[in-house]
Amino acid sequence: MEFYRSSRRLQILGSVILLLSIHVAHSFYLPGVAPQDFEKGDELKVKVNKLTSIKTQLPYSYYSLPFCRPKKIVDSTENLGEVLRGDRIENAPYSFKMREAQMCNVLGRVMLDAKSAKAFKEKIDDEYRVNMILDNLPLVVPIERIDPGQGSPSVVYQLGYHVGLKGQYEGSKEQKYFMHNHLAFTVRYHRDMQTDAARIVGFEVKPYSVKHEYEGQWSEKTRLTTCDPHTKRLVVSSATPQEVENKKEIIFTYDVDFQESEVKWASRWDAYLLMSDNQIHWFSIVNSLMIVLFLSGMVAMIMLRTLYRDISRYNELETQEEAQEETGWKLVHGDVFRPPANSDLLCVYVGTGVQCLGMVLVTMIFAMLGFLSPSNRGGLMTAMLLLWVFMGLFAGYASSRLYKMFKGTEWKRIAFRTAFLFPAVVSAIFFVLNALIWGQKSSGAVPFGTMFALIFLWFGISVPLVFVGAYLGFKKPPLDDPVKTNKIPRQIPEQAWYMNPIFSILIGGILPFGAVFIELFFILTSIWLNQFYYIFGFLFLVFVILMVTCAEITIVLCYFQLCSEDYLWWWRSYLTSGSSAVYLFLYAAFYFFTKLQITKLVSAMLYFGYMLIASYAFFVLTGTIGFYACLWFTRLIYSSVKID
């Protein structure tokens, strides 16, 4: 009866969690900064950010190209996450005044030489986009498209505008490079009817390429004939475009228009975060839930066929097959808790997995509450790094507890390995990738100051916390095995082909990966195609399903393994669910060749390097979930039965 009560409580708890998760599936947005009111005529500070390209994945500073510059370039203060993302936020030469429209403002004039023309052409070839910021809102290009299902036009927003474009003149086949040198900005604002103050709720641009013309010699007071605020002459898309060639003159201009909007300040990010594929996410969740229900049924059957019969004092078995099956796992009771080979390494990986799990869970909770919204630029990465550091306490605790269970005595050695093994592997890959980025002179290269900060977080905070956790864990009394371990190991009989360790481990990773692969597509698209990802409610649901799937598939395969009198379950339980990382990396390779247009070798190396780090982290995370599920299962079944 106790088993049934326990199952019932778990079902009720699971239902409550599911309902709460569905309630927050659409993560709500809490703005990251306080709103700022602007009176008419107030100066608006436009900032420029990095140049980005989905073809190279190498960000560059805005002023790495010979754009017009302010008298003094001032770098904005950036958090750790922004620096690691390659953001370089600086002041811009644009001058806006609140609710005062401007037409054909001349920003400056640049004479191209061979070097600067080549630099512009390279960035146009690689489809680089210019990113700007106004009142913490990113600059977007509105694009109208017609949805095939609805037939009505809808507006989508692309982050930043292209540096330029390639094309041909009419009647010519020669490919030319054209510069977007005229920007038509639209600032949307929401006005307070009582105070007449306004808040910015949108920042849009339409870029044009236009060969500006003027009469006489160039001076600061020269009036253009292609656009003129005095005659209300606007730039039109049919104007002659501006070529990018050596010794060509480029004049940069801009318009600013202010449009009142009904959108309130608290909702200004909705247009950026609006997701049109919610149905796909729900399909993913329903698909994953079907897998969970199937596995839950199998686990329930195993529990009923083992625990219930033993609690009922071994009722007479119906068939000889059942007798043989139940005898199988009971026969290895004297070896099932024998410490595995390389038990120290297993302790280290389990502790690291606990560290990963804690970081991911707390990050998702903060993200669902809105604290890590896109308005808090770099906040997500900063939070993950800091949480990883502080979760070192739990890593040390978990690894030393398991180590003491294996009758280990040198807890400091385990703490040292836990503190250094996983971070050292990740750091080695990261340093190689950073060297490649340095070689490309990209702003994505981590500066020495930031590198020092990362090393301090690791050695100064994370490592001591791991040792503190290990000390606390080792002080606790060890977990007692439910059955005694024989002195002489039992011989494992020859196994059927489908119980081969490699085969069963690889099979075990398919279902956990299947639970997340649809959501994985959206995450990869967000990272590598420069789009926003802010559906952490869906992601949390998928992550819960992933944990349940990892636990259940490991329990099922562990049970079959014990029934075939193979008691070497420790490492296999970890590797069974952890093997889903192999499929994650293979899917990342598939995504690279089918969805991305990366052609440079360095960019490809960056992609696979970062995905290798992600897959490694996924391995220790899922492996630890499977291991703890299996540990709980084996302790439960061997403590609930009477061993003759």
UniProtKB/Swiss-Prot annotation:
It is a multi-pass membrane protein. The keyword Cell membrane does not apply. GO terms for cellular component: endosome membrane; Golgi membrane. Keywords: Endosome, Golgi apparatus, Membrane, Signal, Transmembrane, Transmembrane helix. Pfam families: EMP70. A motif (Golgi retention signal) lies at residues 642-644. Residues 1-27 form the signal peptide. Residues 303-351, 399-418, 473-501, 556-573, 622-644 are cytoplasmic. The keyword Transmembrane applies. InterPro entries: EMP70 (IPR004240), MFS_trans_sf (IPR036259). SUPFAM superfamilies: MFS general substrate transporter. The chain crosses the membrane at residues 282-302, 352-372, 378-398, 419-439, 452-472, 502-522, 535-555, 574-594, 601-621. It is found in: Endosome membrane; Golgi apparatus membrane. Residues 28-281, 373-377, 440-451, 523-534, 595-600 are lumenal. A motif (Endoplasmic reticulum export signal) lies at residues 633-638. The C-terminal KXD/E motif functions as a Golgi retention signal, certainly through the binding to the COP1 coatomer. PANTHER family: TRANSMEMBRANE 9 SUPERFAMILY MEMBER 8-RELATED, TRANSMEMBRANE 9 SUPERFAMILY PROTEIN. Belongs to the nonaspanin (TM9SF) (TC 9.A.2) family. This is Transmembrane 9 superfamily member 9. It comes from Arabidopsis thaliana.
